[in-house]
Amino acid sequence: MADGSNREYLNLSTGQLVELALARGEGELTANGALVAKTGERSGRSPNDRFIVKEPSSEADIEWGPVNKPFEADAFTALWNRVEAYLADKDTFVSNLEVGASKEHYQPVTVTTEYAWHQLFARNLFIVPTEFNAADKPTWQIINAPGFVCNPERDGTHSDATVILNFAERKVLLAGLKYAGEMKKSMFSVQNFLLPAKGVLPMHCSANVGSDGDTTLFFGLSGTGKTTLSADPKRFLIGDDEHGWAPGGVFNIEGGCYAKCIDLSQKNEPVIWDAIRFGTVLENVVTDENRVPDYTNSTLTENTRAAYPLEHIAQRKEENCGAEPHAVVFLTCDVSGVLPPVSKLTKEQAAYHFLSGYTAKVGSTEMGSTAAIQSTFSTCFGAPFFPRPAGVYAELLMKRIESFGSQVYLVNTGWTGGPHGIGKRFDIPTTRAIVDAIVSGELKDVETEYLEKLNLHVPVAIPGVDSNLLNPINTWEDKQQYAEFAQHLAESFQKNFEKYQVPDSIKNAGPNA
């Protein structure tokens, strides 16, 4: 429609957006009906290009540093105006959406995009309300202009692209980026800032619920199994990535899923496989000559994605919310092969491991990361998205666990019998059997063995799981080497934890170096 008419398309349906995306050459239809789009050189988040406007209303509550970098308010206004002027002679797509499946805690947001497929993504991942902004709250605005090229000297940005959050003006500016995940993570960061002030814990986790209403949460970084394990054929999905835990219940912050597609198989992940159909956006997935997606192909990126609305999942919780969780699972992908497949945590240990966020970058979502797998500590299992000091979130977690009596487990979806390259990764059926035992409550009062170096209690038996796997030293041929690796891991935990100002009860809840 680039005929000079400069239309603003408001609240278009899925079919209309797919039609326009194809007509405008933004993507192609695949054999399974999904729309596939390419994002160019930025096929993941760009953390170096993310800023928060430094202004009086929020300045004192933000933990400024390499994750939350300050941006001048005047420079933001000038850049916002420049991007608006750039979009003024383009067709744009606009939707009125919400973030937060809670009458009390939702945020209304108007999303304006240059691309039709970005608008489809926003409508898949955010919530399309039956009545927009029923409580008449002040509305957030997102502008996404991938064709706008930033000039660092003129605009004060880090590169030719940027993501900037402005809490005072309720604005999110995305310029120069095609990777759609930036939109969802921006509004997640917004809720991560706003919710704690209302006593609600925002969480980088997935959630599902059983037929008797029991909720389980799965925390973890990208690639650790959040989406795979929460998409359980025996349970109902609440959401796969972002939730709030308020007194009385858990709610999804989103209205869709953003699942990793690399090596996706119908056998191992039937729920995700079946959700990829007309209306789904596939990002950077390579197709063959018949337009059949090749999920094993990582030519463009390891971080291939499918964005679909929750409606594409048959077994889901209609209201996108649930009761407070009986079980909370911290997923860690241990590349050293030292951690047991499952441990039971006290509330102090839960706070310790929540703050530590130990895991590996597996098929990292960040731009420029190589395929090499490395261990990392990511505070709250999602450091890039939490604007407030980490202690704020840890305190809220302990409060919620204590008041409801949730049991927390540390589950290793990484390696055993040796580090990455020598040992082998726990297979999905083993982890599923462990998770089944957790959600059924079988592990709540199970007999445990104490691993002193790791300061962890591990079950001695779990139905459907080889008991030899439960204490990791049994899976290593060289026991001395295991002891050395365990010592090294304990030391790295302690070194990482030095930065936290927390009570001794939490400080002493980690591994013993």
UniProtKB/Swiss-Prot annotation:
Cited InterPro entries: PEP_carboxykinase_ATP (IPR001272), PEP_carboxykinase_C (IPR013035), PEP_carboxykinase_N (IPR008210), PEPCK_ATP_CS (IPR015994)
Compartments where located: Cytoplasm
Q: Where does this chain mainly localize?
A: cytoplasm
Q: Which SUPFAM superfamilies match?
A: PEP carboxykinase N-terminal domain, PEP carboxykinase-like
Which Gene Ontology terms cover its molecular function?
Answer: ATP binding; metal ion binding; phosphoenolpyruvate carboxykinase (ATP) activity
* Gene Ontology CC entries for this record: cytosol
**Cofactor(s) needed for function:** Mn(2+)
Arranged from A to Z, the UniProt key words for this protein are: ATP-binding, Cytoplasm, Decarboxylase, Gluconeogenesis, Lyase, Manganese, Metal-binding, Nucleotide-binding
Cofactor remark from the record? Binds 1 Mn(2+) ion per subunit.
What is its pathway? Carbohydrate biosynthesis; gluconeogenesis
Q: Which residues bind Mn(2+)?
A: K185, H204, D241
Which leading EC class covers this enzyme? lyase
Q: Which residues bind ATP?
A: K185, H204, G220, L221, S222, G223, T224, G225, K226, T227, T228, E269, R305, T431
State where substrate binds: R45, Y179, K185, R305
Domain of life per record: Bacteria
**What's an example GO BP annotation here?**
gluconeogenesis
Show the catalytic activity. Answer: oxaloacetate + ATP = phosphoenolpyruvate + ADP + CO2
According to its UniProt record, the EC number is 4.1.1.49
Q: Which HAMAP family match?
A: PEPCK_ATP
What family name appears in the similarity comment? Belongs to the phosphoenolpyruvate carboxykinase (ATP) family.
Role description:
Involved in the gluconeogenesis. Catalyzes the conversion of oxaloacetate (OAA) to phosphoenolpyruvate (PEP) through direct phosphoryl transfer between the nucleoside triphosphate and OAA.
Its name, as the record gives it, is Phosphoenolpyruvate carboxykinase (ATP)
- Give the source species: Shewanella piezotolerans (strain WP3 / JCM 13877)
